Amino acid sequence: MTSETPKQYGRVMLKISGEALMGDQGFGLNPPTVARIANEVDSVAKMGVEVCMVIGGGNIFRGLQGSAQGMERTTADYMGMLATVMNALAMQSALEALGHHCRVISAIRMDEVCEPYIRRRAIRHLEKKRIVIFAAGTGNPYFTTDTAATLRASEMNCEAIFKGTKVDGVYDKDPVKHADAKRYGDVSYDEVLQKHLGVMDASAIALARDNKLPIIVFSLDAPGGFRSILAGSGTYTRVHV
């Protein structure tokens, strides 16, 4: 079953986890997987949709885990931010191999490898149909990449956040563990928060709600899934007011 067809989006934010880049590995980057995701993004960009991205860093380093093991939380979070830059550069390389112009923009200055975050410049890149990858989170510890994606999507005037996951939407319970799990077609921000449905962290959901920014949750593993939703089909859950 599919949800109601959403309107055509002109500018979107794609949020994926760092783990999505691992493939079947237990750590790091799997080049064929990175290339496959790049192809998905490229196919959407070729529709004329302006695409920006945020990629997590959990395939390389996760700040919360480092903190739990005795590392100072602030230091651990900064290490996690650096991991997102590595993932962003890998995705940039894969997209450029497909012939698409792409810019990595970091919230932490490292001018030798990527651009600093300047809002107007980032918007101009999107207007020129370049794919923009935002790296290093918000540039501040204690904020997740989900929150960073929602923040940047709001600043870029995106029409929706597309959250690519391992499942094809939001379920009332873990569909991997429970065969009777039911997928939501549409769900409100408040219900996601009240029922702890795990779409994004609470700060990200609250920010999306305050800015009336819909979140489309879909399976990143489904070939052509990202493009099919933008074309008016596909299976997903829409989080909205």
From Swiss-Prot:
Q: Does the keyword Transcription regulation apply?
A: no
- Report the protein name in the record: Uridylate kinase
Residues reported to bind ATP: K15, I16, S17, G18, G58, R62, T165, Y171, D174
**Gene of this entry:** pyrH
This entry carries the following GO cellular component terms, namely: cytoplasm
Q: Which Gene3D superfamilies match?
A: Acetylglutamate kinase-like (3.40.1160.10)
Where it sits in the cell: the answer is: Cytoplasm
UniProt-listed Enzyme Commission number(s): 2.7.4.22
Q: Which reaction does it catalyse?
A: UMP + ATP = UDP + ADP
Q: Which InterPro entries match?
A: AceGlu_kinase-like_sf, Asp/Glu/Uridylate_kinase, Uridylate_kinase, Uridylate_kinase_bac
The record's annotation in NCBIfam families points to:
pyrH_bact
Instruction: Kindly state which keywords UniProt assigns to this record, in alphabetical order.
Output: Allosteric enzyme, ATP-binding, Cytoplasm, Kinase, Nucleotide-binding, Pyrimidine biosynthesis, Transferase
How does the record describe its quaternary structure? Homohexamer.
Entry-linked Pfam families: AA_kinase
- Record-annotated disulphide pairs: none
